[in-house]
Amino acid sequence: VKICVLGKPLSVNHAYVTTKQGRRFLSKEGVRYKQQIRADVLLAAGFSAESMREAARIADPQSRLRVSYTFHLPDLLNSGWPKKAKSRYKRLDLSNLLKILEDGLFEALGVDDSNVFEILLKKEESEAAWTDIEVTVLENDGRAEEAERNGAPRTVP
C-alpha cells in the first residue's frame, strides 16, 4: 500500500499534551493530524470502505510488515549557514515525526503496529512538505508454511 500524507508532519512534541497530574492526551492538533492521515489512507484506498478493508488485509495477524517513510521537508537547510548557524541542516529528529504518523496510519489501516519488523526512515529536501509511506509484507522464510503443513498452528518465525 502506498500512501501520501500532505503537509508537514506533526512532531510528537505537539501531538500530545500533559496535565499537571502527568497524564498524556492527544492534543487538538494531534486529533486533526490523525484525521488527516485517515483521509489520506482513504484516498490511497480509493475512497470506498471495501477498498479500505482490502488495504488492511495486506497484513493478517501473522504477517511481518516493512514500512518505508520518506519525509519531504522544505526547511531542512539553516538559512544562516555558514556564518550564523552552527550546522548546515536544522536539527530535526525523525523519530519525533514518526510516532503520531505511525499511530494514525495503523489505526486507519486497522493493523496492529506490533507486526512491523522493519522500518526505513528518510528525510529529503523539497519545495513542499509531504510524507510518502509504503507498507509491504515481508517475504516469509518458509518456516511457518512448513509448520502449518505439519499440523502446527501458524506462528511468526
Name each model-derived stretch.
Residues V1-P157:
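Acidic, proline/glycine-enriched N-terminal capping motif
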